[in-house]
């Protein structure tokens, strides 16, 4: 009986510490008590990436304003899916942010995607590895990096990673 009660308590505590529903990431962050500066930055990022999917927020159950939080949003498209992740780390009036956006497309090759990105921004630095199975695209200012990973004949996984230090 004690084991059964422990399992129920564990399930309830996990449910209370993890939110998974379709409200916005920034709304989840505010509701969970995440630092207001971090929540504001998350709102801006959410709008710039046009995130509108299933969201999950991980925040400390008793000290969410002072400790890092993790925010995830997944979306499905007619030609693939994407998952966005942001880690917010509060530091008094500042907030440090790392983001990762992984998009899987099943009807466009990595070569096509790479070519399109270079056409839009010719100054991008492009490096290919493992017989072209991986491509890293980096702007001159190193504000982000994109990794293209070949997925079969006509698919590609696009991973974009950023680290932000707003106000510092």
Predicted regions located by residue number:
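N-terminal secretory signal peptides
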Residues: 23-89, 164
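Amphipathic N-proximal alpha-helical interface segments
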Residues: 63-100, 141-168
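Sec-dependent signal peptide recognition
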Residues: 3-11
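Long, charged/polar, surface-exposed segments that mediate recognition or autoinhibition
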Residues: 79-131
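Non-cytosolic coordination micro-motifs
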Residues: 25, 34-44, 50, 130-144, ...
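N-terminal signal peptide c-region/cleavage motif recognized by signal peptidases
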Residues: 17-19
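A cross-kingdom feature marking solvent-exposed beta-strand/loop segments within repeated
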Residues: 56, 70-72, 121-139
């Amino acid at each position: 009986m004690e084991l059964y009660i422990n399992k129920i308590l564990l399930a309830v505590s996990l449910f209370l510490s993890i939110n998974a529903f379709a409200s916005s990431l920034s709304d989840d962050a505010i509701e969970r008590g995440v630092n207001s500066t971090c929540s504001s930055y998350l709102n801006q990022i959410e709008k710039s990436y046009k995130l509108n999917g299933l969201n999950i927020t991980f925040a400390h159950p008793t000290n969410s304003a002072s400790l890092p939080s993790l925010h995830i949003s997944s979306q499905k498209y007619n030609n693939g899916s994407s998952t966005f992740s942001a880690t917010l780390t509060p530091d008094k009036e500042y907030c440090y942010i790392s983001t990762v956006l992984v998009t899987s497309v099943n009807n466009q090759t990595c070569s096509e995607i790479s070519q399109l990105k270079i056409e839009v921004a010719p100054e991008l630095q492009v490096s290919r590895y493992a017989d072209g199975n991986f491509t890293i695209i980096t702007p001159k200012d190193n504000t982000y990096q994109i990794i293209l990973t070949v997925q079969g004949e006509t698919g590609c996984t696009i991973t974009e990673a950023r680290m932000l230090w707003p106000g510092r």
